[in-house]
């Protein structure tokens, strides 16, 4: 909802939008709808087989009517982290906004909206922020006016025929998820006390431990560029096995939860050449242990025999 709010609230008919192959369907489908129903123009920066982009493509794709660059902070399939500061410098030099999907980084990766040049930051609460499902939000740079995606009850200005224009009420029609917000607040307090940098360092250490353990196993294909800093996920396939079957065996036989299939990232799977088979994604948390990582490596090795 929060991504749709930002996209629909800032893009007008005829506007040009630049996005990337790294995007989740929560970004892609709102953009596709704007293209189909409102005449928006879309361009996509391609990803290579490692999940990386050529930043010169952002400049190449700019047009006089480019309204915004809408992109993820990090891929939910390969963990590739985009250089948002570099993208923002290009976008702002052409008068375009920068709308960032931080679902994969909020809470587990340092984010500085001002330094990075982010105009609108969208995030979900149930991933790196460790909050309940059904929570999320938008951080909006001062001076940017987002049209409300929905209007209705607000609890204030009840005699007005129009929805309140002041933030945050303008984007908060209806009864809010109070329980979820309380849970997200508690999670944010924990993250603030623990430190995003400390969380990132531990998760990265666990991710690299797993990668080093599986990368040379015969029959295992690992996706992504591990020469660069990335988020704490590893996507792989085992021989020609269907990813759903591998995930099922990991769950039933080893008690390991993974995410198989397309990951709501169709363009990225096409770039990696995995559109037909999908992949098995391992995600590593601050609460995981090295012993659990080693058990996951052993499980992959056994399934690959």
Where are these regions (language model features)?
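Pyridoxal 5′-phosphate
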Residues: 3-305
